[in-house]
Amino acid sequence: MRNIHKYTAALLLTVMILSLLLTGCSGRKDDGTVTITNVSYDPTREFYEKYNKIFESYYESEHGKKINVIQSHGGSGAQARSVVEGCNVDVVTLALEHDIDLIQNSGLIDKGWIDEFSYSSAPYTSTIVLLVRKGNPKHISDWDDLVKKNVDVITPDPKSSGGACWNFLAALSYAKTNYDSLKEQKSFMKKLYENVTIMDSGARGSTTTFVENGQGDVLIAWENEALTTMDSYPGKYEIVNPSVSILAQPSVAIVDDNAKSNGTQEVSKEYLQYLYSDEAQQLIGESGYRPTNQDILNRFSDKFDLNIRLWSIEAYGGWNEAYKTYFDDGAMFDEIYGN
C-alpha cells in the first residue's frame, strides 16, 4: 500500500515543482512589487494566508513598497526535496529541523541557519494530539488505546511527512515512558502501526481521509490541525489530549542561495523575523499554534493543554540522530512497518 502512496506523493511533488518553476516565483516586478515564495508544510496554509496579509501591510507601511508572498504546502519532507531539486524559493517554514538540514547539505542554505532567529529559528511550536469522532465511540483516552483490536488509526507516512515523524516520536515517547525495554517499546509501536489503515503522504491528506472521507476511528494530528478541524466542523469531533506527547518545533530559514540570486535576502529575513512580533505571535495563538512568546502563550491557556508531559527532540539525540535511528531506510519505522 505504501508504494501507492509514494507514487502519488511523487506525482504531486513533480506537478508542484513544475508549477512553481514555471511561474518565475521570486524577485521584483516591473511595478516595483517584490515577490517572495515561502515553501511550507501541510497544515500551515490557513495561518500563512493570514500572516502574509499582515506582513504585506506592515512591509508597505514600513518601506512604502508592495510585497507579494506566494505560498506552497505539502508534506514537509517532500517540500524540502523539491527545494533541493530546483524549486526557486526564498524561505522555507518546514515541520522539522532535519528537513532544513537536508536543504543546507545541498549548499542552498548557509550553515548556522538554526541560530539566525530566536528559539533556534522556531517562532512557534505545537504538539501531537488524538482526534476522535463526537462521543468518542471507541473510548480513546491515551496512546495505549490505539493498539487495541478494531481501532483504525489514521496518520501520514514518515517517509514524506514531517508531521508523521512527530506523530511517531510522540507515540514512542509514551512507549518509552511506560516500557523499560527496547523490545517492549518496539512491540508497542508495531501494534500501533498495524492498526494504521491509510497512510497519506502529508498531514492535510490524513485529515481529509479522516474528516471528509470518514475513514478511521482516530486521527493522530498536529494540535493546530485538530483545533482547526474542531472549528470547521463544530459538534462533530473531540480532541483527546494524551498523557505524553512531544514538543514539536517547526523550523524556518532563508534559502540563502536563491534569495541572493533573486535579490530578496533582506526582505526574506524581515519576513521570518516578523513572525516573532507581538502581532504575529497573537495570530499564531489564534491559529492553533503555540507562541514562543510566553506572555502571549499564557493568553491561550484555555485553548492549549499545558499539562501534557512533552518530550523534547533532544531526548532522542537531536533530529539528525533521531532521523537515522527511526526514519532512515532500514531504521525502526521500516522494521516495524515493513517494506
Model-identified regions with their sequence ranges:
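Ligand-binding pocket segment of bilobal, Venus flytrap-like solute-binding proteins
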Residues: 178-243
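A conserved helix-loop-strand patch within extracytoplasmic ligand-binding domains
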Residues: 104-176
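Early extracytoplasmic/lumenal segment of secretory-pathway proteins
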Residues: 25-106, 116-117, 222
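Extracellular/periplasmic juxtamembrane helices and adjacent flexible linkers that interface
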Residues: 259-339
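C-terminal motif of bacterial Sec signal peptides marking the signal peptidase cleavage site
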Residues: 20-24
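Bacterial N-terminal signal peptides that target proteins for export
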Residues: 1-12
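Extracytoplasmic
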Residues: 31-33, 64-66, 78, 86-88, ...
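Structural recognition of the beta-strand scaffold that forms the well-ordered cores
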Residues: 37-40, 70-72, 91-94, 122, ...
